[in-house]
Every structure is written in structure tokens, then in C-alpha cells.
UniProtKB/Swiss-Prot annotation:
It comes from the Eukaryota. The lineage of its organism: Eukaryota, Metazoa, Ecdysozoa, Arthropoda, Hexapoda. Coiled coil: none annotated. The tetrapeptide (A-A-P-[AV]) repeats found throughout the protein are also present in many proteins constituting the protective envelope of other species. Keywords: Cuticle, Repeat. Sequence repeats lie at residues 13-16, 21-24, 33-36, 111-114, 179-182. This is Pupal cuticle protein G1A. GO terms for molecular function: structural constituent of cuticle. The keyword Repeat applies. It comes from Tenebrio molitor (Yellow mealworm beetle). The keyword Repeat applies. Component of the cuticle of the pupa of Tenebrio molitor.
Length: 211
């Protein structure tokens, strides 16, 4: 074979290198994290056990009585206090008694029955009603008027006119003299004049008599 001559290498001048201005470069970074799934456990609720409050109450009382020398008057004092964790109470009581002054109301109350018993005299006034006695005495007037037919009897007693004019309330002649006219009408019987009879009666307040 033929061996070729080695090629002669020629070097050309390297062109000049020109650099242009670098453009503005903006950088943006994006970070993407993987989603995290976290599940919280349930919250445990704790209940405290109830506790008892021990708050005792403290009480105190005081009483004093002061009497006089004779014991008629007395002054009593009474006080009481109660204290607790939530309240405080105080009470005071003072009383004054005097037994000597209690006798005055007794005297006043005793006078009231005396006045009330005085009203019992009212029936005494009502018993004074003697008016019916006077009215019953007026009943004798019809007796006198009913014997007006006995005029002949009056004429025979002319001598006793003063006696008959004062009181003629004689009841006995009424029976004897009144029967004569009744018999005379039924039969013709002649009668002699009646005997002279005189009766006198009087009735007044506290006195009554007749003959």
C-alpha cells in the first residue's frame, strides 16, 4: 500500500470572541411540602371530686337581771350572737318591769262593775205603772147609767139625796129592784113599796169600804 503523506495541518487565526451583555435573570423558587396528616387524640376531661366545706357556727348568749331592793322593779338584759362563715347575727332585748305600778289598773277595772249594776234600777221605774188601777175604777160608770129606769126608787129616798148624789154604786139593789118590772109585765100583781134600803161604797187609792 501506499502510505499517504501526512496531511499538513494549518491553523487559521481564531476569530475574536465577543460577549454580549447577560440578560436579567429572575429566580423563582417553589417549595412544595408533602401534606402532613396529624390526628390529635381525644382530650381527656378530668372531674374533681366534690369537697365538703367545714364552716362551724359560733354562738354566744348573755343574760342579766337587776332587781331593786324590794324586788318590785327589775331590769333584764338579753343578748345573743351567732357567727358563721356566711353570716353574722346579733340580737339585743332589754325589758323593764315594775310590779308596784300594776295595782293602778286593778282599781280602774273594779269601778266599772259598780256603774253597770246601777242600771238594774230601771225595773223599779217600770213597776210604777199603776195606771191600770185607775182605769179599772172607771168601769163603775156603766152601772150607774144602766139603772136610770129606777127613778121611783130615787123619789122614795128623797131624804137621802145627799148620800145618793155622792156615791150610788150599790150593787145589791140592782138584783132586788130590777126583778120587779119583769114580773109586773107578765102578770097583774100589785106590790107594796119596797123597804128603804141604803148602801154606800167608796173605792179610792189605798182605801175601799162599803155598807
Amino acid at each position: 500500500g501506499l502510505l499517504g503523506a501526512p496531511a499538513v495541518a494549518t491553523y487559521a487565526a481564531a476569530p475574536a470572541v465577543a460577549y454580549s451583555a447577560a440578560p436579567a435573570v429572575s429566580t423563582a423558587y417553589i417549595n412544595q411540602a408533602a401534606p402532613v396528616l396529624a390526628h390529635a387524640g381525644p382530650v381527656a376531661v378530668a372531674h374533681a371530686a366534690p369537697y365538703a366545706v367545714h364552716a362551724p357556727a359560733v354562738g354566744a348568749s348573755h343574760q342579766a337581771i337587776v332587781r331593786s331592793l324590794g324586788g318590785n322593779q327589775a331590769v333584764s338584759h338579753y343578748s345573743k350572737a351567732v357567727d358563721s362563715a356566711f353570716s353574722s347575727v346579733r340580737k339585743f332585748d332589754t325589758r323593764i318591769t315594775n310590779d308596784a305600778l300594776l295595782h293602778a289598773p286593778v282599781a280602774v277595772a273594779h269601778a266599772a262593775p259598780v256603774v253597770s249594776t246601777y242600771a238594774a234600777h230601771a225595773p223599779v221605774v217600770s213597776s210604777y205603772a199603776h195606771a191600770p188601777l185607775v182605769s179599772s175604777y172607771a168601769a163603775h160608770a156603766p152601772l150607774v147609767s144602766s139603772y136610770a129606769a129606777h127613778a121611783p126608787l130615787v123619789s122614795s129616798y128623797a131624804a137621802h139625796a145627799p148620800v145618793l148624789s155622792t156615791a150610788y154604786a150599790a150593787h145589791a139593789p140592782v138584783v132586788s129592784s130590777y126583778a120587779a118590772p119583769v114580773v109586773a109585765r107578765t102578770a097583774a100583781v100589785g106590790y107594796s113599796p119596797a123597804a128603804v134600803v141604803s148602801h154606800t161604797s167608796f173605792t179610792g187609792l189605798g182605801a175601799s169600804y162599803a155598807w
